[in-house]
């Protein structure tokens, strides 16, 4: 667990761990990516310290403070200003600006996962607003998980969940510490598996599944919203109303086994509770204090349970859902660990919206735009626009057949 002083640490203190982590699962391209990422992060730190940029730029540290930039200094406005700096001050081509900002955004996401930041500032709409648009991007250019990618990713989480469960069963009962560690890993693996299957097969937007910190109405789905017997889940839609979405057969078994592993004390628990140590710890301590326990009693309970999430489960202390940033971080980790092939100009991992678009392509090709629109919770007009490359390809094939029939 990270110390509470993490947010007050300097930015470059994290670089060594970050570069070690991103080197996992990247194969021969890892060194090139790390070198470029290191260069751009060092430039960002120099800019944040006021050592880069126009003459009037003094950095993000308060004028009365003589120190290096820290995580406490970061905000949406800081990343927006840096995006503006990349766009305006360095004469870079727009695709280069997008690439350089992506290095920074990837590090910011890692910092959220590791607990240095609570919010993925770099992905906020206001932060990315100054970035140039991707000129010439066609609807078919946007990421959509392919059949091979879905299979590779789901096979990986299947194997990981099975192996974690097997390891848990092999740990002797007289080794409680090892048992707790194995139980935690089995829980996380089961949660990862359920999340991947939902993203891969339901076409539900990630903001409808998990918590969005900027919108209190999007608190993440709870078990009371899920009916495994009916194959449905109630979600708060983009159109700002509750609606039922379908749970296809491939999703049911991962969800059922995950629920059995989690064993929530009530159906009001989030389906995907955060496992972020600091967040769970804070929730547990505050709730136990509200129930009248003193610090010594709380400390004893926490020491006896090894992991705060297990204490929360045993005492029915509901912890919040994982956030949209956390879900993206989870998919990044799984993508890297699974060695799935990802070739995309904007994303180096299988992003949640790519899972949704991948299912959209399957449905449009199999059943047409009307059925796909209902499943995607979109208008048929919008679906036709976003998946116009499919119709264009089919029309091209039809034209080729017609030419062959007529011209012989």
Ranges and model annotations:
Residues 16-32, 38-141, 182-184:
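N-terminal core-binding DNA-recognition domain of tyrosine recombinases/integrases
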Residues 61-65, 117-175, 390:
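Flexible interdomain linker/hinge and immediately adjacent N-terminus
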Residues 115, 189, 198-216, 365-367, ...:
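A short, glycine-centered helix-capping/turn motif at helix boundaries
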Residues 294-374, 381:
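Short, basic (Lys/Arg/His-rich) helix/loop patches that form interaction surfaces
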Residues 211-306:
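Conserved tyrosine-mediated DNA breakage-rejoining catalytic core shared by Y-recombinases
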Residues 152-206, 210, 266:
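Basic, Lys/Arg- and aromatic-enriched nucleic-acid-binding interface segment
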Residues 129, 401-408:
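C-terminal secondary-structure termini that scaffold catalytic or DNA-interacting sites
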Residues 376-401:
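Catalytic-site neighborhood detector that most strongly recognizes the C-terminal catalytic loop/helix
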